[in-house]
From Swiss-Prot:
The record marks E75 as: Plays an important role in discriminating NADH against NADPH. NAD(+) binds at residues 48-53, 74-75, 111-112, 139-140, 244, 273-275. Belongs to the TER reductase family. Substrate binds at Y225. InterPro entries: Eno_Rdtase_FAD-bd_dom, Enoyl-CoA_Rdtase_cat_dom, FabV-like_NADH_b, Trans-2-enoyl-CoA_reductase. It comes from Vibrio vulnificus (strain CMCP6). GO terms for biological process: fatty acid biosynthetic process. The gene is fabV1. Gene3D superfamilies: NAD(P)-binding Rossmann-like Domain. Involved in the final reduction of the elongation cycle of fatty acid synthesis (FAS II). Catalyzes the reduction of a carbon-carbon double bond in an enoyl moiety that is covalently linked to an acyl carrier protein (ACP). This is Enoyl-[acyl-carrier-protein] reductase [NADH] 1. It is an enzyme of class 1 (oxidoreductase).
């Protein structure tokens, strides 16, 4: 079939398998061009491995460090009539390309929050790798099914205490609007912590540790975003921020546990990037369009792949073997360039000046839209979008 982008809300409901593969190839090419990561781990588990930072982590480990990788994710396959999710095609492309280079790559597809996912992953590690040296936790899900009760818990992207009103961009109509978001209830705050906090990361690491599949010196990292006062009301000071603070709590508990065998647990605070997750957060698209333009001008712009390669090579697995620099909460900070005073001051001053008329001129809004479509495999150089493609891509993912 010939597949074109169809946008609904902040989701593109179609995906292009060839475009998704081209995306993965681009990230692999970048990683190889940077050269090998000297002290990289050799057996890596990535929970949430099919898109965004999780996918880039798997690529950095495999193509930057020569690691055997296991990926866990929840994606839908395509059929002859309907494309699957972008993450499905990303993961399929990754496996194919890794194996072509003689790298071990296996994936489990299903609910990563479930007990079954953890057990099947443990079984696979025991069977094929023995143990793992690194666990990346990169789940971004709006819903979590509690394994014990089957209850569905939903997160809320809302402020706390009062209604938040701000300038935002309507990405469907490309116009500047005033967006208001009602505050979260106590229950919604608790639920957001349950879905997006550190509990499931702890459950994963504890299950892996109890099964004896974590090697001595195993490092684990989970991803977070803090941002600046421009986004704090909806993010760090909102329900989502409470969940991210819970991630810090979990990191501290896990670090105590893993340090006994020479390992570590850290939250890595990353920069804002265009992902399906960030596009759903009110105000983020406009902020990203502003900050990207300034960071590009300053020569410090990074996408997912650049950030993660820097995290591996300059933080966790440095060439001289020295310990990673961390902040006062033991976090790895890769948002350091985004948070530079000159960059943030530029955004603060620009924010009130943005109108529908000057949006494309004063920000990287056009590039934001292009990057968004790229997530789904569209608008990529060298891909023939008039060609007939089969959305039914064969894989040997292990069903959870």
């Amino acid at each position: 079939m010939i597949i074109k982008p169809k946008i609904r809300g902040f989701i593109c409901t179609t995906t292009h398998p060839v475009g998704c593969e081209a995306n993965v190839k681009e990230q692999i090419a970048y990683t190889k061009a940077q050269g090998p990561i000297k002290n990289a781990p050799k057996r890596v588990l990535v929970v949430g491995a099919s898109s965004g930072y999780g996918l880039s982590s798997r690529i950095a480990a495999a193509f930057g460090g020569g690691a055997a990788t296991i990926g866990v994710f929840f994606e839908k396959e395509g059929s002859e009539k309907k494309p699957g999710t972008a993450g499905f095609y990303n993961a399929a492309a990754f496996e194919k390309l890794a194996r072509e280079e003689g790298l071990y790559a296996k994936s489990l597809n299903g609910d990563a929050f479930s007990n079954e996912a953890k057990q099947k992953t443990i079984d696979l590690i025991k069977e094929d790798l023995g143990q793992v040296d690194m666990v990346v936790y990169s789940l971004a899900s709006p819903v979590r099914k509690l394994p014990e009760t089957g209850e569905l818990i939903r997160s809320a992207l809302k402020p706390i205490g009062q209604t938040y009103t701000s300038t935002a961009v309507d990405t469907n109509k490309d116009i500047i609007i005033e967006a208001s978001v009602e505050p979260a209830t106590e229950q919604e705050i608790q639920d957001t912590v349950t879905v997006m906090g550190g509990e499931d990361w702890e459950l994963w690491i504890n299950a892996l540790a109890e099964a004896g599949v974590l090697a001595d010196g195993c490092k684990t990292v989970a991803y977070s975003y803090i941002g600046t006062e421009l986004t704090w009301p909806i993010y760090w000071d909102g329900a989502l921020g409470k969940a991210k603070m819970d991630l810090d709590r979990a990191a501290s508990a896990l670090n105590d546990k893993l340090s006994a065998t020479g390992g570590s647990a850290n939250v890595a605070v990353l920069k804002s990037v265009v992902t399906q997750a960030s596009s759903a957060i009110p105000v983020m698209p406009l902020y990203i369009a502003m900050v990207f333009k300034k960071m590009r001008e300053e020569g410090v712009h990074e996408g997912c792949m650049e950030q993660i390669y820097r995290m591996f090579s300059q933080r966790l697995y440095k060439e001289d073997g020295s310990a990673a620099e961390v902040d006062e909460k033991n976090r790895l900070r890769l948002d350091d360039w985004e948070l530079r005073d000159d960059i943030q001051e530029h955004c603060r001053n620009l924010w009130p000046q943005i109108t529908t008329e000057n949006l494309k001129e004063l920000t990287d809004y056009v590039e934001y839209k292009e990057e968004f479509l790229k997530l789904f495999g569209f608008g990529i150089d060298g891909v023939d979008y008039e060609a007939d493609v089969n959305p039914d891509v064969a894989t040997d993912f292990i069903a959870i």
